[in-house]
Amino acid sequence: MKAKQEIKKIKEFDYDAWIESKELKDIFPPRIMLLWWIGILGMLNYNLVQIVPNSGVALLSVSTFIVGCGLCIGFMLGIEQKKNR
């Protein structure tokens, strides 16, 4: 019975109004999205390098990927600390 009530609540929830009340930048801060894209591009470059081996491109893509991941992790930790204050 309780499960049916929960399902009913979920069905009645107005997602459009909730999304409009939250701005997209609050859900996905632009800096973090940019860093995720850096990481994703680094991964794609790394995959291309495995197909077309070239030491210069490999070094660039691996460093891009590592920097992107490091920055993402750093920002995530920073946000967690900000919330905890």
From Swiss-Prot:
Keyword Transmembrane helix on entry: yes
Annotated keywords: Host membrane, Membrane, Transmembrane, Transmembrane helix
Membrane-crossing segments per the record: 32-52, 59-79
Domain of life: Viruses
Cellular compartments per GO CC: host cell membrane; membrane
Signal sequence bounds: none
Chief subcellular location: host cell
Compartments reported by the entry: Host membrane
Membrane topology: Multi-pass membrane protein
Name this polypeptide is given: Putative transmembrane protein ORF28
Taxonomic path: Viruses, Viruses incertae sedis, Halspiviridae, Salterprovirus, Salterprovirus His1
